[in-house]
A protein has these predicted regions:
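A short, conserved alpha-helix in the catalytic core of glycosyltransferases
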Residues: 112-114, 173-179, 184-190, 196-224
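Active-site donor/metal-binding and catalytic loop motifs
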Residues: 133-135, 197, 219-241
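A conserved acidic beta->alpha catalytic loop
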Residues: 47-56, 105
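Glycine-rich, basic loop-to-helix element that forms the pyrophosphate-binding segment
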Residues: 76-92
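Short beta-strand-to-loop acidic/aromatic patch adjacent to the donor-nucleotide binding site
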Residues: 94-105
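Conserved donor NDP-sugar-binding/catalytic core segment of glycosyltransferases
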Residues: 108-149
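A recurrent flexible, glycine/aromatic-enriched loop bordering the glycosyltransferase active site
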Residues: 82-83, 159-184
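Short, acidic, metal-binding catalytic loop of nucleotide-sugar glycosyltransferases
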Residues: 30-40
Length: 302
């Protein structure tokens, strides 16, 4: 474990919980070294009682030139992702804090630069999702099954309306990992609620608390834009009944807390914000948008 006492505060801390995922974590760390190694970024890995070679990997990485300047890690014992994320938030030095996962690979330099600039330029944005946002709607049907949580009348995924979603951020109700939040927000509204351990709906609850405190929640499809790659996006398998039961419990807890707010605010107008793109960001966006044209034409014909 590495102390941060001699380091300047980071502009962004990426908090990465990990458990027995040595090879993939190594690629994640290498991606941050490659594309953000010269930036004022802190990587904080929370090692959750790993029994593979993760500890040795972290010790080796933290003693490299880049690691001494940018990498810290802390140990926990089978605490689960939510508690590990909170512990990382407590230890983070960054003005901005990212909830990252150990199978997400940074793929460019412009993404971190743009994320920092988003929060500099758009002071009303408190939390930014980097994949997809979620909008929620009031319906009277009870939540009895896991599938009820995903009813399209109740929950809709979005990256904003086409074609403007290539060049702007879209206000949403909530989002999914990865996301970036202002430290100021966490200090005001608190960390992830550990009532949601072990999994899911914790970040939705946080998003609604951020909104209740006066900030907005935004999203942009940065994975689609090539800013990062999430291995889990392509390897999701069949969910077990026990997993669905845990998610159902958490989803019910969320809706018990926030359904009145959903009913009150779902019809509000949604803000948008221009992406503060670098030249590289503009060029990459143009390339990705052109690549998407054939698929878009097929969808419209269908």
């Amino acid at each position: 474990m590495i102390d941060s006492g001699s380091r300047e505060p980071a502009a962004l801390t990426a908090v990465i919980p990990t458990f027995n995922n040595e090879a993939i974590l190594g690629r994640t760390l290498e991606s941050w070294r490659t594309y953000a190694g010269s930036m004022n970024v802190e990587i904080l890995v929370v090692e959750d009682g790993c029994r593979d070679g993760t500890t040795a990997l972290l010790e080796q990485s933290a003693n490299m030139h880049w690691g001494r300047a940018r990498l810290r890690w802390i140990h926990m014992d089978d605490a689960h992702e939510l508690r590990c994320t909170n512990e990382g938030f407590r230890a983070a030095s960054g003005t901005l804090v990212a909830a990252w996962q150990d199978d997400m690979f940074l793929q460019c330099e412009w993404l971190v630069t743009e994320l920092i600039e988003v929060f500099e330029r758009h002071r009303d944005v408190g939390l930014l999702g980097l994949s997809r946002g979620l909008d929620m709607f009031p319906i009277d049907d009870p939540i009895e099954r896991w599938e009820d949580l995903l009813d399209w009348r109740r929950l809709r995924s979005t990256i904003g309306p086409f074609p403007w979603n290539w060049v702007r951020l879209q206000e949403v109700d909530s989002t999914i990992r990865p996301w970036v939040i202002r430290r100021e927000c966490l200090e005001r509204v608190g960390l992830l609620d550990e009532a949601f351990v072990p999994t899911e709906w914790d970040e939705a609850d946080l998003a609604f608390r951020v909104r209740a405190a006066g900030w907005k929640v935004a999203t942009c499809g940065y994975e689609r834009l090539g800013g990062y790659y999430h291995v889990g996006s392509s390897t999701l398998g069949t969910l077990s009944d026990s997993y669905k039961a845990r998610v159902l419990r958490n989803g019910r807890l969320f809706h018990e807390r926030w359904d009145p707010e959903i009913r009150r605010t779902h019809a509000r107008s949604r803000s948008t914000w221009a992406r503060p793109m670098t030249f590289e960001g503009w060029a990459n966006t143009g390339i990705q948008a052109l690549r998407a044209v054939p698929r878009r034409l097929v969808e419209r014909r269908g």
